[in-house]
From Swiss-Prot:
Domain notes: The N-terminus of the protein extends into the stroma where it is involved with adhesion of granal membranes and post-translational modifications; both are believed to mediate the distribution of excitation energy between photosystems I and II.
Residues the record lists as binding chlorophyll b 5: Q173, F270
Protein name per Swiss-Prot or TrEMBL: Chlorophyll a-b binding protein type 2 member 1B, chloroplastic
UniProt binding sites for chlorophyll a 1: W88, S94, E107, R227
Binding-site list for chlorophyll b 4: Q173, R184
Organism this protein belongs to: Pinus sylvestris
Record note on quaternary structure: The LHC complex consists of chlorophyll a-b binding proteins.
Annotated positions binding chlorophyll a 5: K221, Q239
Amino acid sequence: MASCGIGSCAFAGGQISSLKPHTNQLLGVGAGVHGEARVTMRKATTKKLTASASTSPWYGPDRVLYLGPFSGEPPSYLTGEFPGDYGWDTAGLSADPENFAKNRELEVIHCRWAMLGALGCVFPELLARNGVKFGEAVWFKAGAQIFSEGGLDYLGNPSLVHAQSILAIWACQVILMGAVEGYRIAGGPLGEVTDPIYPGGSFDPLGLAEDPEAFAELKVKEIKNGRLAMFSMFGFFVQAIVTGKGPIENLADHLADPVNNNAWAYATNFVPGK
């Protein structure tokens, strides 16, 4: 569902100098403190895209806007230099450059988690409906298995990961994800600070960022698919609360009886707690 996932554009770009300033320019003078370096990098987001990206219909002043020819003039601070900029900001959230840089990073990271999450919600349930055995395939019920007597077997196989302690799982998540996030934000083993959104290097094993034009397009695909995935996850949350079923089962019910299984029918008959 995401044409640009975690292993591709998600962490690519560490070596593409044509699309981002040199590391020393991003760091400014005091790169010794990670926090100061990161703030300096955020201020560096006012750098313009090079010609390779500006020729794309997704970048620059002539880019595609959110309502096409009926969009009107976008705000002056939305110049089309970043992927996913369709010239829409009615709340003025991007008016401050530093807030804009921070929100851009937050959006991209949430997009990546949403793409992984949406896949994780749908795929196990889809496999279970096609004969693959799972302890519990529905995404919002699966985690509770760790509190059962038998614990939680990843992919239904006890020889892979047999989890029995929620504290151990929590500790592993903190350590492993903390290490990855630390690398993404503060750089590699030598301490070189890279772009925290597209760190490249070890995060781009397929070398997808080597072509600047293709990389610029992958960034757009990532943000578009990621925004769709965030809406999908919101829909999955609502479905779980209202119907108590997973997304695949809800889809099957709707296709079997679209008149009685749709958003309007559930909204008009929904009673919280029942």
